[in-house]
Amino acid sequence: MCSIGEDDFGDDGAAHAMAVESLPLGIVLSPGNCSKCDVNSDELYKLNFRTAECRECFLAYARHKFRAALGAAKILPRNAEVLLVLDGSAESLVLLDMLHFAQTQNTFKRLHCNARVVYVEEQQVQGRDPVHLEALQNLSTQYAPFDFYVIELGALPSSMQRIKDYSPSLNANNELIHKLQKLRSLTARQDYLQQQRKNLICSVAQCLRCTHVFESNISVDLATQLLTAIALGRGGSAALDVALLDDRLSGDVKLLRPLKDLNEQEIQFYIHAQRLKPLFQKGSRYGREHGQTASLQNLTSAFVANLQQNYASTVSTVFRTGDKIAANSNPEQSSCVHCRSTLDTELSDTLLAIEYSRSVSEAGVSLYKSGQDLEDLAKKRLENKDGLCHACRAIQAELDSGNLL
């Protein structure tokens, strides 16, 4: 029987509306007794709205969230082939450490799955130096017997290599980089890059014959992603963007987010408790260096972060709202050939207005055309059988030349 109370793992609920305690929050407090096990400890961990606890009790609490996310929904079959996506962030290292711990328990507590790890090298796309190989090799040694692979974003799935055989590519003719340069706005570039990354991970999973993919998104990531999806015109698929299970990937590959219930403070405490060393910070992701107002994604992220500082319930409210949105699961509807989201085949007045405005803008000096002609052109665009959803069609419209696919 678990010795940790059930109340420790529930939704924070109304606790978010409480005034912040006067007790200082931090990793290291003065030595004392753990409020859970009553053992004297030199280092206590104090989370928001929780009493101070020792390292072992905190780790048990955090790891229980990981196991509970997978166990409650029973979505991971026994002995499933799992691909863990590593990007060097603190969140991905926490996921790696938790999965490794779950794999090294005794038979009764062990998470029965066969795991592999793939590191997606994104630094070349961002114009930065690649990660130090020594750091990756140290991770491979520390988390044996997991098999570690490396693939560069924008490369073919067949170019994937084991960590011991990998050397950074010096090829500057990355097709993905050239296509990103053709997109006019940072919003379109970030959206396109996210879809390309997801498609690459799916292809890697198929190459390794993995049926499930673990990603390290936490609650604040999913809250931001929900609002971003709506702003980009991906509201129809927003439910799957924040769900524990995303089954839109091709080849029956399922994407899981087992850290969805963890917050940023818990991640930072776990990093400290396990003495993990992230390879990159979250703020180093593509396009963040251009500022908060450079794209819809950056602006939404800053908006959520600023609200969270003043109103502690922001992330929880948005995140839990996303949990309540039902996904459209009609198997008869076609999917977008780029992002795999369900296509909306009904003629929407909103989309018609957007395409009408775009037609007027492109007409220029040809505005002598009647309004009916422009409306017919807008309808024709919406009925175009290009296989793209509204959001991906917007990316296509941003391309100076060429095709999205």
From Swiss-Prot:
It is found in: Cytoplasm. It holds the Pfam family CTU2. GO terms for molecular function: nucleotidyltransferase activity; sulfurtransferase activity; tRNA binding. The keyword RNA-binding does not apply. Keywords: Cytoplasm, tRNA processing. Belongs to the CTU2/NCS2 family. The keyword tRNA processing applies. The lineage of its organism: Eukaryota, Metazoa, Ecdysozoa, Arthropoda, Hexapoda. Its main location: cytoplasm. One of its GO terms (biological process) is tRNA thio-modification. One of its GO terms (cellular component) is cytosol. Plays a central role in 2-thiolation of mcm(5)S(2)U at tRNA wobble positions of tRNA(Lys), tRNA(Glu) and tRNA(Gln). May act by forming a heterodimer with NCS6/CTU1 that ligates sulfur from thiocarboxylated URM1 onto the uridine of tRNAs at wobble position. Pathway: tRNA modification; 5-methoxycarbonylmethyl-2-thiouridine-tRNA biosynthesis. Transmembrane segments: none annotated. It comes from the Eukaryota. InterPro entries: CTU2, Rossmann-like_a/b/a_fold. This is Cytoplasmic tRNA 2-thiolation protein 2. PANTHER family: CYTOPLASMIC TRNA 2-THIOLATION PROTEIN 2.
